[in-house]
């Protein structure tokens, strides 16, 4: 099963709110997911990002591929750097 870490759109029309979820790559964007690991609110100034770092690192270690936007969010939170350092430490 190919697993992706991606955004699931929530919220009202013209007022998006996203959940960062781990899902099978074949499931629809807003469909079934395996685990919710955070939230992202781009409407707030500045944008609110809350991610469970431990869960994100666990899924990245298990081979889950983040989408481009999620990769940028992880980089801004310092999660990608920690993941790369842990891979080099092996």
From Swiss-Prot:
It holds the Pfam family Ribosomal_S16. GO terms for molecular function: structural constituent of ribosome. GO terms for biological process: translation. PROSITE patterns: RIBOSOMAL_S16. GO terms for cellular component: cytoplasm; small ribosomal subunit. Keywords: Ribonucleoprotein, Ribosomal protein. The keyword Ribonucleoprotein applies. HAMAP family: Ribosomal_bS16. Belongs to the bacterial ribosomal protein bS16 family. This is Small ribosomal subunit protein bS16.
């Amino acid at each position: 099963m190919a697993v992706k870490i991606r955004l699931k759109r929530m919220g009202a029309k013209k007022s998006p709110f996203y959940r960062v979820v781990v899902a099978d790559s074949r499931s629809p964007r807003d469909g079934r997911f395996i685990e919710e690991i955070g939230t992202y609110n781009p409407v707030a100034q500045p944008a609110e990002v809350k991610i469970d770092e431990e869960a994100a690192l666990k899924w990245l270690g298990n081979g889950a591929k983040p989408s481009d936007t999620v990769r940028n969010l992880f980089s801004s939170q310092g999660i990608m750097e920690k993941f790369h350092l842990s891979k080099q430490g092996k």
